[in-house]
Amino acid sequence: MSDTSTGNGKVVVNRSMSLDGFIAGPGHAMNWIFDFMAPDAFPEIAAATGAMLVGRRTYEVGKRMAAGAERGSASSGEAYPFSGPVFVLTHEPPDPPDAAVTFLTGDIGEAVARARSAAGGKNLEILGADVAGQCLRRGLVDEILVYVLPVLLGDGIRFSSPGLARIDLEPVSSTRSGAVTILRFRVRK
């Protein structure tokens, strides 16, 4: 789906969203996503991704979901088919740190540059509302990929944070896979 043949991967905001515009439910709950899609539902996206930059809250939610999957909770238990470098942007790295990820503090532009460099010419996937908002405000995003799920959550974390200025998008594709509608937009710069 993404062109990485030039060796200049894109910065892609990637998120699942309820029909009423929420990317997470109350309490940052995201396990509802697995009611509609498995973590490995789109292997071509994982194959085009060279690195991920996530926010601390998204990282913590992911850890809780993975722990729940190991115990057989509502999460699917299937692994996301991505094994590249993961960067977590945070004000306070955990103590002790998680050896599986690189914690970054500081400027969003520097964080994107470092993670993009580690992506090896593939896409840098941005996860997390706050980090995505910072990237969008700074004009660092090339594409937005949205998986629209057939559910109304009613409350939670919105797709974009208040105060984000208008950003014009160019539709690239619209496809459907099972219950999921996949929308891809290019950010007009």
Indicate residue ranges for each PLM-predicted region.
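Enzymes that bind and transform nitrogen-containing heteroaromatic metabolites
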Residues: M1-K189
